A protein has these predicted regions:
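Anaerobic metallocofactor- and corrinoid-dependent redox/one-carbon enzyme cores
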Residues: 1-207
Length: 207
């Protein structure tokens, strides 16, 4: 089972700008929802032959239900500004502290093209590939739903994924890449996705 709970994160992080207090508030709020779901899952398991394998606590965003906005509510600054790393770390710590049977990533996900605020900051270039890679040191994923110019070369992709792999090996943690080269689009041009789960953004020049 999994959660789409960026709204819960936003409410908890908006309650305090002290990292320890915000982390505790998130642990409490998300923990209440998680335990309630786990109780339901346990009852279903008893009544059926289904096996409850655990709960992925990753607070997945979806467009306007934004994890980027939740982080900005804590930092009082645009995503990518100083304080973003701290917010990412405290969210991750809160998730890991919730006493339920966890499965999947159970970590912070920052998918650029699935979150209105993240896509907006990408367009504004307040956050870059290298920053997203740095945040992955304290998150559950690596480079997640990153839009790239369609003329990116194989060598550039190799270097980008290689940097992520280097970090994964150094930190002894799995990281993944969902990179989206947009065919026919160049840097400074805007994507034109019509997918209901994706947000459009302006492509950044490659570093």
């Amino acid at each position: 089972m999994a959660l789409q709970s960026a709204n819960v994160v936003a409410e908890a992080l908006g309650s305090s700008h002290n990292p320890a207090a915000a982390q505790k508030a998130l642990e409490t709020a998300l923990g209440e929802h998680a335990r309630a779901i786990e109780n339901i899952a346990g009852n279903i398991e008893k009544q059926t032959r289904w096996k409850y394998a655990g709960l992925d606590l990753s607070p997945a965003p979806l467009k306007e239900v934004s994890i980027g906005a939740a982080i900005e509510g804590f930092t009082k600054a645009k995503f990518g500004s100083s304080g973003t790393m701290t917010a990412a770390a405290l969210i991750t710590a809160a998730l890991h502290a919730i006493p339920v049977k966890q499965a999947g990533y159970s970590g912070l996900m920052l998918p650029i093209l699935e979150d209105y605020t993240l896509a907006r900051r990408w367009t504004e270039r307040t956050v870059t590939v290298d920053q997203m890679l740095a945040y992955s040191a304290v998150c559950g994923t690596g480079l997640d739903v990153i839009p790239l110019p369609g003329d990116i070369s194989v060598e550039q992709l190799e270097r980008m994924i290689g940097d992520m792999a280097t970090l994964a090996v150094k930190l002894h943690k799995p990281l993944s890449a969902r990179l989206l080269p947009v065919a026919g689009k160049k840097a400074s041009e805007r994507t034109e996705f019509e997918d209901p789960f994706l947000v459009n953004a302006t492509l950044q020049p490659l570093p």
